[in-house]
Amino acid sequence: MMAVTPVRLVTLLIVLQLASPAWGHFTLPPLPPREEYGNIIMDRVSSREGQKPVVFPHWLHRARYTCRVCHGELDFQMKRGATEISERGNRTGKFCGACHNGKIAFRSNGNCDKCHSGDSGYSAGRFDEFLMKTSLPMAASGNGVDWSEGVRRGIIKPQSFLKKKSQDMAFDRQLLLEAEMAIIPPAVFPHKTHTAWLDCDNCHPDLFNIKRKGTHFAMEEILKGRYCGVCHMTVAFPMDDCRRCHPGMHE
């Protein structure tokens, strides 16, 4: 019988680690049904005031507008509950009221139940109809739509401003981000894909230091909703789709 020396034991452990799926090292959070992914329940004050919470379907809005319209021009914070939305503000043209004024979209007066449904799956039927009409490219996870590819192909052309035209910055630099674990190939970050939807200040400097390698982040933190996880856990494609960021990863 061959003796197991310390060197052989270490070698065996390395081989076993390389043979195991990299994502097996992380506990991925459970995902909602495809038709509910990206539907955010907003309940900062609604329940306290005896109203059903608002359900915000990102898919419905991102088909028409880029992220920067709400999370820039209209001052919606990325953090849930951090924006002091009120009925009074909406009726005076702030926040949701910037569009829901009876001209761009239905007005809030007399249409309370359209937003205050309290049911994250209320728009499931409309979502399926939308997919059939648009024929958007599909994705393996999230709500099943590759939104960025849909924009690249011109299938959808979301508007990037309401009144304040954004100053687009031509920056298409692609970053190669080395992973902390040797068995995981580098992540590829395409700026151009993100700037099609966002402004630079949506990420810099609050989420990421603008200096290269100035932000030290790990997958464990991303899975807690920090850094990339601010979007890629709730609205943008989730962490389950490993190869979207780590293209060198194998099954």
Predicted regions mapped to residue ranges:
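N-terminal export/targeting leaders of redox proteins
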Residues: 1-52, 109-184, 196, 247-251
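Sequence context surrounding c-type heme c attachment/ligation sites in exported
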Residues: 38-134, 180-251
